[in-house]
Amino acid sequence: MAKITGNLVATGLKFGIVTARFNDFINDKLLSGAIDTLVRHGAYENDIDTAWVPGAFEIPLVAKKMATSGKYDAVICLGTVISGSTTHYDYVCNEAAKGIGAVALETGVPVIFGVLTTENIEQAIERAGTKAGNKGSECALGAIEIVNVLKAI
């Protein structure tokens, strides 16, 4: 029985990153964490392109454009949706998650879900590099690994 695994070497890989402007004070940290991790694992900065979109709801469209361009080995999607007093949060979270997942399945390109969905701003800040690590960095690791798993198959 073969065991297929992916390494964490990003040398020679190209990445697209889609980041939401809404809650940019958190998303900037997610983006920095992702880029830092990609570079530390061998990616060159000129092999990383970033696109900014208004909010999490708009991420899937740009992720699909990147994924179908043929330029990227993986696309990382970053954003933050913080619960409020209305159901808007539920709609945005659900549609962003469905859309991002659909892009990966439709294109065969790894598309990583890095949209924080938190109950409050404190949880978001914790996940952007304070107490709970940096989810942008974790998404970058996931992107590197899944690209290499797919190459090994």
Swiss-Prot record:
Keywords: Riboflavin biosynthesis, Transferase. It holds the Pfam family DMRL_synthase. It comes from the Bacteria. SUPFAM superfamilies: Lumazine synthase. It catalyses: (2S)-2-hydroxy-3-oxobutyl phosphate + 5-amino-6-(D-ribitylamino)uracil = 6,7-dimethyl-8-(1-D-ribityl)lumazine + phosphate + 2 H2O + H(+). Its EC number is 2.5.1.78. Pathway: Cofactor biosynthesis; riboflavin biosynthesis; riboflavin from 2-hydroxy-3-oxobutyl phosphate and 5-amino-6-(D-ribitylamino)uracil: step 1/2. PANTHER family: 6,7-DIMETHYL-8-RIBITYLLUMAZINE SYNTHASE, 6,7-DIMETHYL-8-RIBITYLLUMAZINE SYNTHASE DMRL SYNTHASE LUMAZINE SYNTHASE. Catalyzes the formation of 6,7-dimethyl-8-ribityllumazine by condensation of 5-amino-6-(D-ribitylamino)uracil with 3,4-dihydroxy-2-butanone 4-phosphate. This is the penultimate step in the biosynthesis of riboflavin. This is 6,7-dimethyl-8-ribityllumazine synthase. It comes from Actinobacillus pleuropneumoniae serotype 5b (strain L20). The lineage of its organism: Bacteria, Pseudomonadati, Pseudomonadota, Gammaproteobacteria, Pasteurellales.
